[in-house]
Swiss-Prot record:
The gene is aceK. It is found in: Cytoplasm. This is Isocitrate dehydrogenase kinase/phosphatase. GO terms for biological process: glucose metabolic process; glyoxylate cycle; tricarboxylic acid cycle. Bifunctional enzyme which can phosphorylate or dephosphorylate isocitrate dehydrogenase (IDH) on a specific serine residue. This is a regulatory mechanism which enables bacteria to bypass the Krebs cycle via the glyoxylate shunt in response to the source of carbon. When bacteria are grown on glucose, IDH is fully active and unphosphorylated, but when grown on acetate or ethanol, the activity of IDH declines drastically concomitant with its phosphorylation. GO terms for molecular function: [isocitrate dehydrogenase (NADP+)] kinase activity; AMP binding; ATP binding; phosphoprotein phosphatase activity; protein serine/threonine kinase activity. ATP binds at A316, P317, G318, V319, R320, G321, M322, K337. The active site is at D372. PANTHER family: ISOCITRATE DEHYDROGENASE KINASE_PHOSPHATASE, PTHR39559. GO terms for cellular component: cytoplasm. Belongs to the AceK family. Keywords: ATP-binding, Cytoplasm, Glyoxylate bypass, Hydrolase, Kinase, Nucleotide-binding, Protein phosphatase, Serine/threonine-protein kinase, Transferase, Tricarboxylic acid cycle. It comes from Pseudomonas putida (strain GB-1).
Amino acid sequence: MTQHWPAGEIARMILDGFDDYREHFRRITLGARERFEQARWQDIQRAAAARINLYEQKVGEVNGWLRDAFDDEVLLEVEQWPLVKSAYIRLIDPRLDDELSETWYNSLFCSLFSHDQISDGCMFIHTTRPSIRSHQRAAQTRTYCLDASLQSLLRAIFADYAFAYGDLESDVSRLEAQLREHLPDWVCKDSTLTVELFSPVLYRNKGAYLVGRLYNSDEQWPLVIPLLHREGHGVEADALITDEAEVSIIFSFTRSYFMVDVPVPAEFVNFLKRILPGKHIAELYTSIGFYKHGKSEFYRALINHLANSDDRFIMAPGVRGMVMSVFTLPGFNTVFKIIKDRFSPSKTVDRATVIDKYRLVKSVDRVGRMADTQEFADFRFPRDKFEPECLAELLEVAPSTVVLEGDTVLIRHCWTERRMTPLNLYLEHASEGQVLEALEDYGLAIKQLAAANIFPGDMLLKNFGVTRHGRVVFYDYDEISFLTEVNFRHIPPPRYPEDEMSGEPWYSIGPHDVFPEEFPPFLFADMGQRRLFSRLHGELYDADYWKGLQAAIREGKVIDVFPYRRKGR
């Protein structure tokens, strides 16, 4: 080893790469307003995918910089990396996005070293950022007081958030009525009533969102005002939302990531946490596009939970998967999914295809109907954190992925998703009204995914879950495809009477052929549920319905899927 080991130079190069990533990330994000104002819906989808892919692309570039600048015997001397970490800490201490720069450093370390060399001495398993920072600032917000009337307050808001509104006075009247409907009359007349909105606008898909809170001397309510651009009619304020559950859904793990310019991410996350206290900060960071840091915060929450509870891993409730094995911690609202070594004979996919399908979900518009995933490699857990039956099953079905190393269980590869109640189990215990609502939403989920060019493939009830807000969400991705890749067909009429009696089809079936007429018995064993779903969403059984959606997608149409209830529409 040379006398001078280049810890400072390596740390600086890693941070320079982070600055480059942040600049490109911000450039894509800042284009969101123009794309919204010009109604460039397909460009919005492309920009969202490009921003998601940017992180790994830039990590790869910086990995190349480091390998070009330093010999491997120097760069990969892992015993020296605590020096790099120390130098890096000094560099990021004055920054306003220091928590993100820790995650970036971790990504570079993991791109250079195998996971068995991970330690808190070399990287940031635990954050070094103080919970209260000397440079921490309050979020950038605008405040509006009830000086005259609710309409005057709303007009003041829209004067500051200036767009080419089509009929602002009509919007103001409608939003005032919604506000009076949502809040008690005495609140609407309270002279201390104040609106605080985050200064930057949030953009996602075909919408823009003003986000903040309403408060008086006693209480506070979240506040979201979605804006839509009606081509040829200008921008309109579509709704005024103060219900915490509805606002939580807007920031759901089933949604695409917002584009919002946040030079100090912790500011905005702390602001959101005040109005959505039920959201974990991992989910809030992820919701604004910092999904890698969301992953860091998730992992820290997981290891903290394991260290401070008696929780043990169990197999997740529900029908065992044919491709994936799923386990969970009862006290931690997450499932862990691993790929089995052998699939059921009816499955034609292979391991590489399953991985590609799950990675695809990260970059497509999930329209509130697909759970976001996080991919992990080389998780290590204490053996005594597994129930024996759970560990035995995992070792049996996935011995290449789950490895016992003394008192440690190594999970070589897995995905995490939010835990939900499987739809088939939910229906078993649901009331008549709950069955109706769940099947209505199940059909809507399929339709909205299809309109976003996603075909679930395996649409069985067990592959959908019900969230705590009662929404039906798809979560099993090994057979998903783009809708435009599927060949929807009507079943040809039988050639002879004997054809109908045969157990074999009398027509050829290609690898991408789907016959919607076959859905009813495939989806529903319960005849009552089958009849109800046919009444609610019978068009899903018609190949022409699916072909119509395909035609619209090929024409470049981008559908409206709203993450909130639209009042009076």
